[in-house]
Structures are given as structure tokens and as C-alpha cells.
């Protein structure tokens, strides 16, 4: 089926690419795609296109990659050119998903039907850059995707629709991301169909209560503080997969931990200092925490691959009594 509603799309990572693909496959014309500039990535630090750019180029869509859309910012000339391109590209609505650039009011006012954002949380909880990570880290029982009519605030726009999903005990940011991306893609296509049919999308202002902010994940957060309870550390490991990983330092070597679960403690574990390895078995490496203990079942040494505990221990022996370093506390 083909549609007449013209969609400018703005997004960057895989989460956004899933939405762009759904919009395109549903038959909506996409006259322009905005995405962030190519960035150095990988071991060779070669310039790599975003997931959104790769999809757009493969399907013959026009792509623009302005470093900013703010005339008063660091790149005023590039911003002015991009805004002019938006003004001169015939379209009806803009869809934004994990774009990574701020949209000033001038840009929000250009599309006839405004700008719709796909956000990976149940707003107003987890506004901001890392909603999936923070939901897992906080131990939330559920999360979801919210469509909102954008305004100049940080994820403060009126809500059009949401989809809720449970967070499973073994969910990581990677697994939860994929389910949320699929839900976001489905929601936005349904919303665009209604917008084309009805000419408008009713929206409800966000409640003032329940607002939390999902700060961007920093590499410095990767270090595991063994003084924390085991269940908190298990959530941190899951939240930081695939980035930046949970890091445990032993004799100066940073070992990444990719899968872990709290375990019941006995007297030996309870008396061990936080960070102490109390068992190194094929089933997992058990480490004493501030409260309880953590069984680590997937590890990665520097320069190596993710390995199950059995394979990791075969090449990098660990022993009871060794102790992971405790990070400095601010």
C-alpha cells in the first residue's frame, strides 16, 4: 500500500533504523533523512555511517548530516543550510528517533503536522539519553515506548500513545532494545496511518509526577563497586550490555563481566571482604559483595572474546581468595 503523507525522518542508531525501515516498508514517502555525521569507530577508528544512513542509502533516500540544527551553536552555517533544506523539502510531518541533536523551536515549527518523537521509556519516567539502560539498572519491572508530540523541552512533549512491556530477569540493554525498537516501529506506522486519515493525532500532556532522567552512560560507570549489594551489581551488568560492560579489575587487568546473578550466601561468603573471589568453578565465579554474592557466568579478558566461565577459567585461571579492586568513591 502507498500513502500520501510525506515523512522527513531524523535518527541515528539501530533503534531509529528499525522505525525508518517500518515507515518505508509501509509505503510512506520519505523525501529526506537526517542523521548524525559519520563517526570514527572500531579498532581502526575508521569513519562509519550510522545505521539510519546505511538504510537510507541502500534504499535511495536523500540524506543530510548536519552537525547541528542550532543557528546559535558551534556550526551556525551548517545549521542554517540544514534548516533551509527542511523548509524547501516538501513534507507533512517529521519523525524523530534517537537522533542525538537538539531541535530548536524553529525546526519544530516547520512540518505542517509537527514533529513526533519515538522515545524508549514510559514517559515521564526516564526522559533523556539512556532510558533502556537506566530502567534495567533501577530494577524497573516494566518499561515501554512512548510517542510524543515534540516541544523544545527534553522529552517533555504531550504523549500520543505508549506500549508497555515487562522487563525479564535476564534482559540486557541489548535484548530489551530490540523488543522496544520493534514496538516503536509498529507504533509509529500506526500513528502515521491515523494522522493521514484524520489529519491530527490527539495527545495528552505528561503528568508532573514521576519524572526521572536517564543520564547518558559514561565509561567511568563501568567499574563494579563490590561494596554494593549483589542484586544491584547484577542489574548493572545487565544494563551495561552491550556498552560499556561491567568491569572488574584484578592485578591491574580490567576484566569485563557480561552475565551475572545474585546467589544465596553462607557463612564463608558473608565473612569475605567485598570483591573477594570465594569460588572459581566451571558454573561461575562467585564474588562476595557488600550484601550477598554474585555468580559471574560470562567474562572477557582484555583483548579477548566473551567466554562462558568454564572456557574463561581454562585460559585465565582465577582462584578463591583473589580480590577484585574496589573503585575510588567520589
Curated annotation (Swiss-Prot):
EC number of this enzyme: 2.1.2.9
GO molecular function, a single term: methionyl-tRNA formyltransferase activity
Keywords of the record: Protein biosynthesis, Transferase
SUPFAM superfamilies the record matches: FMT C-terminal domain-like, Formyltransferase
Coiled-coil segments on the chain, per record: none
Superkingdom as given in the UniProt entry: Bacteria
Residues annotated as binding (6S)-5,6,7,8-tetrahydrofolate: 121-124
GO cellular component labels: cytosol
Reaction(s) catalysed (UniProt annotation): L-methionyl-tRNA(fMet) + (6R)-10-formyltetrahydrofolate = N-formyl-L-methionyl-tRNA(fMet) + (6S)-5,6,7,8-tetrahydrofolate + H(+)
Family from the record: Belongs to the Fmt family.
Xref: NCBIfam families: fmt (TIGR00460)
Function summary: Attaches a formyl group to the free amino group of methionyl-tRNA(fMet). The formyl group appears to play a dual role in the initiator identity of N-formylmethionyl-tRNA by promoting its recognition by IF2 and preventing the misappropriation of this tRNA by the elongation apparatus.
Protein name from the UniProt record: Methionyl-tRNA formyltransferase
UniProt organism field: Burkholderia cenocepacia (strain HI2424)
Lineage: Bacteria, Pseudomonadati, Pseudomonadota, Betaproteobacteria, Burkholderiales
